[in-house]
Amino acid sequence: MKLNKVLIINEGYSDNLGDQAINDSLQYLLKSNSIENIEFQDFTKNIDAPIEISTGSNTSNKSPLMIQFFKKIIPSKIRWLIKNINRIIKASKDNYDLVIIGGGQLILSNATFSIAMFSWVFFLRLFGNKNIILFAVGSGTKFSFIDTLLYRKTLKKISKIYARDEKSKEILKNTFNIDSEFVYDVAFIHNKITN
């Protein structure tokens, strides 16, 4: 099947150089296989460019009192969903031949990753984008009840899962009853494409 339009979703706009390298490497791999129509969306952040890496000291990061109040009463997953749902729906309405989520350590029990994975997969499939793969993803080891529930529901809806290490494959099988295949971490080719 010829892939005319591919959507990549990962943490490519984070301030982590490894995440940026993963995104660059994945785009390079697709382009080197004659796939030119590539769109990108950040997995968890509603931004249009990579976060600049700060080298100075952080001055004041104090939020106004009203924001602090809402952060305390609204659960983090709901806050994330409110901030990102419009972006996810808009991107999901386009038609893609393939959606690649990954690489990186995206199967984690934290404030945003499980709800991000659930939201992306739910809305992509709702709008007809069912050819979704997780590529070169890593997994954490411990999951909260809600994160386990969200990942179990979501991972079953993904066409193919490629884990970047054997431990992640084992966790996917034992925790979520999901089979996956091994693939090398795509970030390792970054040095070859930058030289």
Describe each PLM feature range.
Residues 2-143, 153, 187-188, 193:
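Aromatic- and Gly/Pro-rich donor/ligand-binding loops
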Residues 144-195:
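A nucleotide-sugar donor-handling region in carbohydrate enzymes
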